[in-house]
């Protein structure tokens, strides 16, 4: 009798253990199936909703050839070329159809109609305040003017290089430059920048920190000023904050999708003498023609050779992007 009871109890315990094992196995299998299903669902959702950042943006994200986007139906754009020229050019040409004529000429060089954009600017100083370099390849035509030689040089330094910049609060803090690649760049309708170098006791060196008139003036009524001071020394800065902003910038390297073409002048502007220009090459050329039609004809003729020394980038440059990351 006792043997039968013990057997019954043993069978009951074995059944409970077996049932528990089966339930755990089923739970593990269900967890595996559910997690796999969720993983596949998330992956498919991310793939179908993916955005190829920079590929669907006009002009800035174009590609060399036409490809089909793997996640969307739109096709990529073709390479784009922006030609920036002064108002003087269109005034001298005085032809309402001159852009269409040039577009047809660019077509003979392999640039499809609609891939070349003509951008007019009023003056070098105005263009330097808000450069808009949105195309895959950007050619900036600058008419040489001896009185604006320094402005042209600073603009070339700005647009031919990439800069990493951060805002500066000159009312609260002192600032110093850490090396040759570190510059302060001020931009605005009228920038007057004064500095007072400080010693280790934060006393002015040759100036009084409480007297702005004793500060050293390094830019006056400029629209663009790239400021270089002695490295490793704190400076108190004064500038016209109502009409100007200033940023603490580091030169990262060449912006290879931009070239500057100087029109006229006895010498080509040279920014490679700056020790921060590395490598010591530049995409600056000169054409010596008196008439703008001749200038544009020359550019059409040599456009493919010019582009060969450039590299297309998807990043664009405007004043806002320049301030934070170019």
From Swiss-Prot:
Sugar-bearing residues? Answer: 69, 238
Whether Cell division counts among this entry's keywords is: no
Q: Where does Ca(2+) 1 bind?
A: 95, 206, 214, 216
Tell me if Disulfide bond is a UniProt keyword of this record. Answer: yes
How does it get modified post-translation? N-glycosylated. The N-terminus is blocked possibly by pyroglutamic acid.
Binding-site residues, Ca(2+) 2: 177, 228-229, 231, 301
List keywords of the entry alphabetically.
Answer: Calcium, Capsid protein, Disulfide bond, Glycoprotein, Host endoplasmic reticulum, Host-virus interaction, Metal-binding, Outer capsid protein, Signal, T=13 icosahedral capsid protein, Virion
Region of interest called GPR motif, as start-end residue ranges on this chain:
253-255
List the Pfam families hit by this protein, alphabetically: VP7
Subcellular location(s) per record: Virion; Host endoplasmic reticulum lumen
Does the entry annotate any disulfide bonds, and if so which pairs? 82-135, 165-249, 191-244, 196-207
Where does it mainly reside? virion
Entry's family note? Belongs to the rotavirus VP7 family.
Another remark in the UniProt entry says: Some rotavirus strains are neuraminidase-sensitive and require sialic acid to attach to the cell surface. Some rotavirus strains are integrin-dependent. Some rotavirus strains depend on ganglioside for their entry into the host cell. Hsp70 also seems to be involved in the entry of some strains. In group A rotaviruses, VP7 defines the G serotype.
Name of the protein described by the UniProt record: Outer capsid glycoprotein VP7
